Each structure stands twice: as structure tokens, then as C-alpha cells.
Amino acid sequence: MLIVRSGDRILRELEWTFTYDFPNYQTESTRPDDFKEFWANTLDELKQVPLKPEMKLNQKWSTDTVDVFEVRLMGLGNKHFWGWYCRPKKKGPLPGHFICPPTGLYQPGGPARSENVCTFSIAIHGFDLHLSDVPPGPHPWKSYHTLGLESPDTASWRWIYASLVRGMDFLSDQPEVDSNRIAVSGSSQGGGLALVLAGLDHRMHAVFPQYPGLPRLDWTVKHNTGYWPFKMSAKPKGQTEQQFLKTLSYFDAANFTADVQCPAVILVGLLDWVTASGNLVNAAAHLKPGQVQMICDPWGGHGSASMTYRNRYRQSLNQFLQHNRSPIIKPSK
């Protein structure tokens, strides 16, 4: 604990978790007793919903080497969601890359075209890729982060996480995709979503989060470790703090990492004050020895790691996608 004083008067008290021996870092878990049952039931419910993929070629974004499609899929509760699918024209099988979006309605932005990799960029807000169906004025899904937090069953994140698995259903079903070489990545919110998907679905073979949000949601509420995505102001009326934190525990990315089976390469800015780096370190501690490499920029913030560290991250990603080799160059434990 750091205490700042002016004479006898205490100006500020700060307390934080400091990890100095990551390979031996033992951390607690907020995972509820029925966590695995909750998600097994959710995914069983998803299996009852037909995939119903609709693919529309987008001429504007397509090139001589890549066909770009707008994809609409059916998610939990028969609610649709969209994504960009980029299919190279070269003969497969080709590696697959599932890309999770940063926060906000304006993500995922444009498609991620590649001449050598099939990419699927998912939109998780439930609106189409051009936002042409976003109504004027207030709408519940415009504030999807806090929608339905009254209970785990009604939380928007239940639908969102199930949609990730449904997106993987689509990507892994494409005949040109090498089912033995699928990666999932994302930055900020997308980094947290990538960890969640890797925990829920074992069809990917490597996960590459950057500056991930969504680990240790309880800390963001109680201790202000990063300001995204929740504060106590998101607590539904009439709930206690304990009830609110119990709901969040079903969607905390740190509670999924123990189930991740593939290698993980994580880009971290240690001075990240948006999605605090300590939250991610806590989540990564649940990964097994030899399974994780953290690329840590000591002076990097949120999305602002130096080119040196970004290049190390890209090297690992390309090593897996382009050369079908393990992405881990130097394990962190």
C-alpha cells in the first residue's frame, strides 16, 4: 500500500496487486460453482438454433485476390448478428483467423482482407455491418455493455459470448479453411472476447489477445483498476454489490482462462489504465506452464505499445498462420 501524506493528514491511499514472480503467481478465482453448468446449458440452447448463414458478396471491398462477404448468422434466441468473411481466391485449405472487435457500435469497421488467410470479423452489437438498421434515439443495444445485468440469464454478454461460438461454427464449416490452423485475436474488448472464446470453444489452435478487457470485472467495480467496462454505477437498482458481482462473475474473462487449451500470446501495455494490465496478468496466471507468452511493454498504454513489442506480437501471429508453427517463442512460465 502507498500512503501519500501532508504532515499528519493522509491525502491518498493506494493499494494494488504487484506480481514479481509470474511463473509461481497463485491467484484466486471468482468463478461460481455452477459456472460450467451455466455455459454448458447456454451452448446446448445455442445448438437448438439453426445456423442459417446468409452470405452476400460485397463488390466494393472485394479485390482480384480476395472475395469479401457480408455474413448474417442466427444466434441465441433467434437474434441475428453479422460479420465480414474474407475468402482468398487461391486454392485452400488455408488458415482461419477469427477477429473479435473492440468496443462500440462502429466496430468491427471494415473487413480484414488477406491473400493467404480466411478471416471472419464478428460484430457483436446485433446491428448490420453498415449500421443501417440502427434506430434514431435510445435503443437497448446501443448500450449493450450494461444491458440485462439484472441476472446472468438476461445479460447481453450471454448472447454475445454464445455468438462468438456461433461465429466459430461458421468459420470452421467453410471448406477452404484448414480446421487444424484457426487463430482467434482481438484488441481491448476484443482481446477479452478472444480469451472467452478460447475457453468456451476448443476448435481454435492459438489465441492472440492485445490489451484485453473483461478480466477481473470485480476489480473494475470495486477498485477502479481500469475504467472499462463497469463501475458501480452499472449496478441494477435494488441489487447489492454482492449480487451485482455474482452476475459479472459469469462473464469475467479471467474465469474462462483455466479452460483454454491452445497456446496464448498476449500483448500487454503495463501502463494501460483503460483495461488495466494487472487484470490481465491475473487472468493469464490460470494458463498452464508453457502455454502462454506475455509480450510486455513496460511503458506501453492501452493500444500504444511501441513498434518493437508490436512486431514481436505480429511475428508470433505470422509464425502460426503463415508457417504453421507454435506461436510461443519464449514462454512466460
Predicted regions and their residues:
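N-terminal targeting or regulatory segments adjacent to alpha/beta-hydrolase or S9 domains
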Residues: 1-65, 330-333
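Short beta-strand element of the alpha/beta-hydrolase
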Residues: 83-87, 92-103
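Cap/lid segment of the alpha/beta-hydrolase catalytic domain
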Residues: 106-162, 219-226
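Gly/Ser-rich "nucleophile elbow"/oxyanion-hole loop immediately N-terminal to the catalytic nucleophile
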Residues: 143-187
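Hydrolase active-site cap/lid region
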Residues: 191-239
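Short beta-strand/loop motif that positions the catalytic acidic residue
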Residues: 259-260, 266-268
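Acidic catalytic loop of the alpha/beta-hydrolase fold
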Residues: 270-275, 303
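C-terminal catalytic histidine-bearing segment of alpha/beta-hydrolase fold enzymes
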Residues: 281-333
